[in-house]
Design a protein with these regions (language model features):
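Switch/communication elements of ASCE P-loop NTPase nucleotide-binding domains
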Residues: 36-39, 43-46, 52, 66-183
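Short secondary-structure junctions
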Residues: 50-64
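A generic structural signal for short, non-catalytic loop/turn and secondary-structure boundary residues
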Residues: 1, 60, 176-179
Length: 183
């Protein structure tokens, strides 16, 4: 999967073949402020929410700063920026941990695809075991009234599998935390 840097320019027409390396996911996120502002909010929620990945980062796109008339003054363009919750420092994806940029295309796809198939190899690549557990929740935590994507996952992560099995057991035993959806 690619890691966009400061020179990344989103394709205004993301293509199907760009999903294999994550390019189309970054394109969609960069362009989401113009077309689907809910997407960037959902992805940012996955990164910042304590009950999800809890990475202490929010995500913004250059379009959110309302500087379309003269973005060159601040050096911002339609790109994705990570912002640490406890500071105002804006970072490009290549300036944060590799694991965050590797998991972002999966989170983006999970919030775009409905009634489709998302195939991914090693979603656990370069991420901490605690984040791997949250990825297990990403695969299972959808409201029942939402058209869910089907995930085809090739993984070596015991953490992801154990989280999914835990959610299945909690659903079966009626012990699922209130904030979670049944599996």
């Amino acid at each position: 999967r690619i890691i966009p840097d400061s020179s990344f320019t989103p394709n205004p027409y993301p293509e199907q073949n760009g999903w294999f390396d994550g390019t189309s996911a970054w394109d969609k996120l960069c362009l989401s402020q113009q077309n689907d502002s809910a997407l960037i909010k959902k992805v940012s929620d996955w990164f910042s929410n304590r009950d999800k990945l809890n990475t202490n980062y929010n995500i913004f796109s250059g379009g959110e700063f309302d500087i379309k008339t003269s973005p060159q003054l601040l050096g911002l363009k339609d790109n994705v920026y990570f912002c640490k919750i406890d500071s105002s420092q804006m970072l490009f994806p290549n300036q944060v941990g590799v694991g965050l940029t590797q998991i972002a295309p999966l989170i983006i796809a999970a919030n775009i695809v409905q009634d489709g198939l998302i195939a991914i190899e090693q979603p656990e690549l370069h991420i901490h075991p605690a984040l791997q557990l949250a990825v297990g929740d990403l695969f299972t935590q959808y409201p029942l009234d939402v058209k869910r994507p089907m995930f085809l996952v090739e993984t070596h992560s015991e953490h992801i599998l154990l989280r999914i099995l835990k959610r299945i057991r909690q659903t079966t035993d009626n012990e699922l935390p209130e904030s979670n959806y049944p599996v």
